Protein backbone atom coordinates (compact mmCIF):
# COMPACT_ATOMS: atom_id res chain seq x y z
CA UNK A 1 0.00 0.00 0.00
CA UNK A 2 1.19 3.54 -0.44
CA UNK A 3 2.68 5.80 2.16
CA UNK A 4 0.94 8.73 3.77
CA UNK A 5 0.01 11.38 1.22
CA UNK A 6 -0.07 14.98 2.41
CA UNK A 7 -1.09 18.09 0.58
CA UNK A 8 1.70 20.43 -0.39
CA UNK A 9 1.64 23.90 1.08
CA UNK A 10 0.54 26.69 -1.24
CA UNK A 11 3.33 28.91 -2.55
CA UNK A 12 2.66 32.29 -4.14
CA UNK A 13 5.57 34.28 -5.60
CA UNK A 14 5.17 37.66 -7.25
CA UNK A 15 8.08 38.68 -9.44
CA UNK A 16 9.07 42.35 -9.60
CA UNK A 17 8.94 44.30 -12.87
CA UNK A 18 11.84 46.60 -13.73
CA UNK A 19 12.55 49.06 -16.55
CA UNK A 20 16.31 49.23 -16.55
CA UNK A 21 17.07 49.52 -12.85
CA UNK A 22 13.78 51.22 -11.90
CA UNK A 23 11.12 49.21 -10.06
CA UNK A 24 7.73 49.54 -11.75
CA UNK A 25 4.55 49.95 -9.64
CA UNK A 26 3.11 46.62 -10.85
CA UNK A 27 4.32 43.06 -10.69
CA UNK A 28 5.70 41.12 -13.65
CA UNK A 29 3.75 37.99 -12.83
CA UNK A 30 2.62 35.78 -9.99
CA UNK A 31 3.35 32.07 -9.87
CA UNK A 32 1.01 30.03 -7.66
CA UNK A 33 1.62 26.39 -6.83
CA UNK A 34 -0.47 24.03 -4.75
CA UNK A 35 -3.37 26.43 -4.21
CA UNK A 36 -6.69 25.00 -3.07
CA UNK A 37 -8.39 27.19 -5.65
CA UNK A 38 -8.93 30.79 -6.65
CA UNK A 39 -11.30 33.64 -5.83
CA UNK A 40 -12.47 35.91 -8.66
CA UNK A 41 -14.03 39.20 -7.56
CA UNK A 42 -15.68 41.35 -10.21
CA UNK A 43 -17.68 44.54 -10.25
CA UNK A 44 -16.25 46.05 -7.09
CA UNK A 45 -17.55 49.61 -7.01
CA UNK A 46 -18.30 52.18 -4.31
CA UNK A 47 -22.08 52.51 -4.19
CA UNK A 48 -24.52 53.71 -1.54
CA UNK A 49 -26.04 51.14 0.83
CA UNK A 50 -29.45 51.18 -0.87
CA UNK A 51 -28.00 50.80 -4.38
CA UNK A 52 -30.34 48.76 -6.60
CA UNK A 53 -29.32 48.61 -10.27
CA UNK A 54 -32.53 46.84 -11.29
CA UNK A 55 -34.52 49.87 -10.13
CA UNK A 56 -31.91 52.48 -11.11
CA UNK A 57 -31.77 53.48 -7.44
CA UNK A 58 -28.69 54.97 -5.80
CA UNK A 59 -25.24 55.47 -7.17
CA UNK A 60 -21.66 56.15 -6.17
CA UNK A 61 -20.49 57.50 -2.86
CA UNK A 62 -18.22 60.52 -2.58
CA UNK A 63 -15.24 61.83 -4.50
CA UNK A 64 -12.62 59.64 -6.23
CA UNK A 65 -10.50 59.13 -3.09
CA UNK A 66 -13.60 58.11 -1.10
CA UNK A 67 -14.61 55.67 -3.83
CA UNK A 68 -11.13 54.11 -3.90
CA UNK A 69 -11.10 53.69 -0.10
CA UNK A 70 -14.56 52.09 -0.10
CA UNK A 71 -13.74 49.69 -2.94
CA UNK A 72 -10.47 48.61 -1.35
CA UNK A 73 -12.18 47.97 2.01
CA UNK A 74 -14.96 46.05 0.22
CA UNK A 75 -12.63 43.78 -1.70
CA UNK A 76 -10.52 43.11 1.41
CA UNK A 77 -13.68 42.03 3.28
CA UNK A 78 -14.92 39.97 0.32
CA UNK A 79 -11.61 38.11 0.03
CA UNK A 80 -11.62 37.30 3.73
CA UNK A 81 -15.26 36.17 3.62
CA UNK A 82 -14.41 33.79 0.76
CA UNK A 83 -11.35 32.29 2.48
CA UNK A 84 -8.50 34.32 0.99
CA UNK A 85 -6.77 37.59 1.88
CA UNK A 86 -4.77 40.50 0.51
CA UNK A 87 -1.63 38.39 1.04
CA UNK A 88 -2.83 36.02 -1.68
CA UNK A 89 -3.53 38.50 -4.49
CA UNK A 90 -2.64 37.12 -7.91
CA UNK A 91 -3.82 39.95 -10.20
CA UNK A 92 -5.77 43.23 -10.02
CA UNK A 93 -7.45 45.13 -12.86
CA UNK A 94 -8.45 48.77 -12.39
CA UNK A 95 -11.06 50.33 -14.67
CA UNK A 96 -10.71 54.10 -14.35
CA UNK A 97 -13.16 56.58 -15.84
CA UNK A 98 -11.82 59.65 -17.65
CA UNK A 99 -11.12 62.48 -18.16
CA UNK A 100 -7.58 61.83 -19.34
CA UNK A 101 -6.00 65.31 -19.62
CA UNK A 102 -2.79 64.14 -21.28
CA UNK A 103 -4.32 61.16 -23.03
CA UNK A 104 -3.12 58.47 -20.62
CA UNK A 105 -5.12 56.80 -17.87
CA UNK A 106 -2.53 57.71 -15.24
CA UNK A 107 -3.24 61.39 -15.90
CA UNK A 108 -6.86 61.01 -14.78
CA UNK A 109 -7.75 62.68 -11.47
CA UNK A 110 -9.78 59.50 -10.88
CA UNK A 111 -6.65 57.31 -10.74
CA UNK A 112 -5.48 57.41 -7.11
CA UNK A 113 -2.21 55.53 -6.66
CA UNK A 114 -1.71 57.53 -3.44
CA UNK A 115 -4.88 56.04 -1.93
CA UNK A 116 -3.95 52.57 -3.15
CA UNK A 117 -0.53 52.81 -1.48
CA UNK A 118 -2.07 54.25 1.70
CA UNK A 119 -4.42 51.25 1.88
CA UNK A 120 -1.74 48.64 1.22
CA UNK A 121 0.72 50.33 3.62
CA UNK A 122 -1.85 49.77 6.37
CA UNK A 123 -3.19 46.34 5.41
CA UNK A 124 -0.56 44.52 3.31
CA UNK A 125 2.70 46.51 2.88
CA UNK A 126 4.24 44.01 0.46
CA UNK A 127 1.69 45.11 -2.17
CA UNK A 128 2.52 48.85 -2.13
CA UNK A 129 3.50 50.15 -5.57
CA UNK A 130 7.03 50.86 -4.31
CA UNK A 131 7.47 47.34 -2.89
CA UNK A 132 6.24 44.21 -4.72
CA UNK A 133 2.64 44.65 -5.91
CA UNK A 134 0.73 41.95 -7.74
CA UNK A 135 0.52 42.14 -11.52
CA UNK A 136 -2.07 44.72 -12.47
CA UNK A 137 -3.41 46.72 -15.33
CA UNK A 138 -5.06 50.13 -15.44
CA UNK A 139 -7.65 50.48 -18.17
CA UNK A 140 -9.25 53.81 -19.06
CA UNK A 141 -12.97 53.77 -19.77
CA UNK A 142 -15.53 56.33 -20.88
CA UNK A 143 -18.20 55.11 -18.46
CA UNK A 144 -18.96 52.59 -15.73
CA UNK A 145 -22.30 51.12 -14.56
CA UNK A 146 -23.44 54.39 -12.95
CA UNK A 147 -22.55 57.87 -14.19
CA UNK A 148 -20.94 58.97 -10.91
CA UNK A 149 -18.70 55.91 -10.51
CA UNK A 150 -15.04 56.61 -11.31
CA UNK A 151 -13.30 53.29 -10.59
CA UNK A 152 -14.07 49.58 -10.65
CA UNK A 153 -11.84 46.69 -9.59
CA UNK A 154 -11.52 43.08 -10.68
CA UNK A 155 -9.41 40.91 -8.39
CA UNK A 156 -8.02 37.38 -8.57
CA UNK A 157 -6.64 35.80 -5.40
CA UNK A 158 -5.47 32.31 -4.48
CA UNK A 159 -7.13 30.19 -1.83
CA UNK A 160 -4.52 28.96 0.63
CA UNK A 161 -4.46 25.45 2.06
Describe each region flagged by the PLM.
Residues 1-73, 77-91, 96-161:
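N-terminal presequence-like segments and the immediate start of the first folded domain
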